[in-house]
C-alpha cells in the first residue's frame, strides 16, 4: 500500500511568494503555484496565471513546470518592480521559501508524493503534552485542535518522538540557514521521521518563519490552503511541534497511524 505525504511551507506575505511543485511521483511533476500579491495596503492570494495577467506580462509559457519556473519568476520580478509590487525571489527544491517579514496571511504551497511503507517501529504516544514540549509548542497544538474541533474532527495527540523530530527540524533550519522541507541534514521530512524511529500510514509537515506567537503562526497556516489541509486532515492522528525562538522558526509534523 502506498503512503500519502503532504508538505506545506508557510511564508510571510506583503510580496509575491511562489508556490511549490505538486508531485504525483518523484519523476512526474506538475505545478499548481499560488502567489500572494501586495499592492499598497491590499493583499490578495491568486494563481500564478492570474498574477501574470495582473502585471500584464506577455509570455509564451502556457503551463508552468519545473523546467520553466525560473523563467516565470524572473518575468514576475521584472514586471512587478515596474508595477511597484513587491516580489520575493526564492530558490527552490520542493517548496516555497520564507519571506523576511510576517503579516496576517501566508502563501500556500502544497506538495504530495507517494512512497513505500516505512518499516520503523511505532513510537509511544500520549494524550497530554510531555514535559519536554514547550509552552509555545503546546499552545500551537491547542490552537490546531481547536480548528479541527470546529470541523468536527478528532483532536491530534502529541507524540513525544514526533515532537523531538519537529524541534530538530526547526533547529536544523536555523543552524544551516535554510527554509525548506528538504533538509541538508535529514533529507525529506519522511526520511527524517524514519531516522527518529517513527512509523505511520500517512504523514505531513508545515513549516513557517517569522511569526512571533502561536496565535500568529496558526492563523497564517489557516489562511493558507496547503497548510490548512494539513491541519484539517482527518487521516492525521498525532502531531509534533518544534519552535526555535531565535529566528522564530516553526515546524508542525503530522502522522496518521
From Swiss-Prot:
SUPFAM superfamilies: PR-1-like (SSF55797). Coiled coil: none annotated. Residues 141-254 form the SCP domain. Residues 121-134 have a biased composition (Polar residues). Keywords: Signal. Residues 1-26 form the signal peptide. Residues 80-135 are annotated as: Disordered. It comes from the Bacteria. It holds the Pfam family CAP. NCBIfam families: spore_YkwD. This is Uncharacterized protein YkwD. It comes from Bacillus subtilis (strain 168).
